[in-house]
Amino acid sequence: MARVTVEDAVEQIGNRFDMILVAARRARQIAVQGKDPMVEEMNDKPTVIALREIELGLVNAHTLDADERQTVREREAAEIAAVAAIAEGRSL
């Protein structure tokens, strides 16, 4: 697929504005946070990869929210373990 049409992604999300927000969040995850793409990269930029994932129904606002909640839970668990280790006087 050489080009991604925004219309295909809009159909998956429901409206153009929500699609833009979801695509931006997912592209940021791929570009900045180091998340792995769910589709083949094919030398595409993160925004195009995000649109392709949306078009295929792999990503939506709910999946991004769930992923973010899981990341927060993991980070909090690591912080709690670090505080417990410090309180017990042992190093990580």
UniProtKB/Swiss-Prot annotation:
The gene is rpoZ. The RNAP catalytic core consists of 2 alpha, 1 beta, 1 beta' and 1 omega subunit. When a sigma factor is associated with the core the holoenzyme is formed, which can initiate transcription. Gene3D superfamilies: 3.90.940.10. Keywords: DNA-directed RNA polymerase, Nucleotidyltransferase, Transcription, Transferase. Belongs to the RNA polymerase subunit omega family. Its EC number is 2.7.7.6. The keyword NADP does not apply. HAMAP family: RNApol_bact_RpoZ. This is DNA-directed RNA polymerase subunit omega. SMART domains: RNA_pol_Rpb6. InterPro entries: DNA-dir_RNA_pol_omega, Pol_omega/Rpo6/RPB6, RPB6/omega-like_sf. The lineage of its organism: Bacteria, Pseudomonadati, Pseudomonadota, Gammaproteobacteria, Alteromonadales. It comes from Shewanella oneidensis (strain ATCC 700550 / JCM 31522 / CIP 106686 / LMG 19005 / NCIMB 14063 / MR-1). It catalyses: RNA(n) + a ribonucleoside 5'-triphosphate = RNA(n+1) + diphosphate. Promotes RNA polymerase assembly. Latches the N- and C-terminal regions of the beta' subunit thereby facilitating its interaction with the beta and alpha subunits. GO terms for biological process: DNA-templated transcription initiation. It comes from the Bacteria. One of its GO terms (molecular function) is bacterial-type RNA polymerase core enzyme binding. GO terms for cellular component: cytosolic DNA-directed RNA polymerase complex.
